[in-house]
Amino acid sequence: MAKTASPGATPPGNGTEPLPDNYEMALAELETLVARMEGGALSLEDSLAAYRRGATLVAFCQQQLEKVEQQVRVLDGATLKPLSSGTAATDGEDDDL
């Protein structure tokens, strides 16, 4: 006999949900999906749908992070440099104030 979803449970996704409006919403949805999957209460089909939705959300989040990184590069130009140990030691000092 096929396993039925519990009353009130919504399937994690069938691939037709629109993408969230922003990174934070996508991350929150992804965390919810992970918690549901780790809970072990999802059917095999729902687990697969949740995995697919999660993969879509991860790709969306990566894309959003890349966009922001590109914007930071444009704003900072070529001044982005790896943080050195000497720079970290002076971060606590506020000479400009």
From Swiss-Prot:
Keyword Cytoplasm (UniProt): yes
Enzyme class, first EC level, given as a word: hydrolase
Function: Bidirectionally degrades single-stranded DNA into large acid-insoluble oligonucleotides, which are then degraded further into small acid-soluble oligonucleotides.
Oligomer status and interactors: Heterooligomer composed of large and small subunits.
Reactions accelerated catalytically: Exonucleolytic cleavage in either 5'- to 3'- or 3'- to 5'-direction to yield nucleoside 5'-phosphates
UniProt-listed Enzyme Commission number(s): 3.1.11.6
GO biological process, one term: DNA catabolic process
Gene3D superfamilies the record matches: Exonuclease VII, small subunit (1.10.287.1040)
Region (Disordered) residue spans: 1-22
Family listed: Belongs to the XseB family.
Protein name in UniProt: Exodeoxyribonuclease 7 small subunit
Keyword hit for DNA-binding: no
GO cellular component: cytosol; exodeoxyribonuclease VII complex
Pfam families: Exonuc_VII_S (PF02609)
Subcellular location: Cytoplasm
Any one GO molecular function term: exodeoxyribonuclease VII activity
Keywords: Cytoplasm, Exonuclease, Hydrolase, Nuclease
